Swiss-Prot record:
Disulfide bonds join C31-C76, C40-C59, C45-C70, C49-C72. Residues 1-27 form the signal peptide. Belongs to the DEFL family. GO terms for biological process: defense response to fungus; killing of cells of another organism. Keywords: Antimicrobial, Disulfide bond, Fungicide, Plant defense, Secreted, Signal. This is Defensin-like protein 155. It comes from the Eukaryota.
């Protein structure tokens, strides 16, 4: 009897965790845009992204050897 109830409890917890992850993923709509800052300085990138889109900016390199670009990620 204890094994059956323990199994049901485990399945219930698994199902609840899956539904909570799905709901969280639906609510977080994030968009990204490249801000033209050449060269990209992390502080300027963050400030520009905050003022323009109220988002998070970071310098990223799209290809090896290329100059970094400012990638701004914000709520859509």
């Amino acid at each position: 009897m204890a094994k059956i109830s323990c199994s049901y409890l485990l399945i219930l917890m698994l199902a609840l965790s899956v539904f909570s992850v799905v709901e969280k993923a639906k609510g977080d709509k994030r968009c990204s845009i490249i801000i033209d800052l050449s060269p990209c300085y992390p502080i300027e990138c963050r400030l520009s992204c905050i003022t323009e889109r109220n988002g998070d900016g970071e310098c990223v390199v799209s290809k090896v050897g290329s100059t970094p670009n400012c990638l701004c990620t914000y709520d859509c």
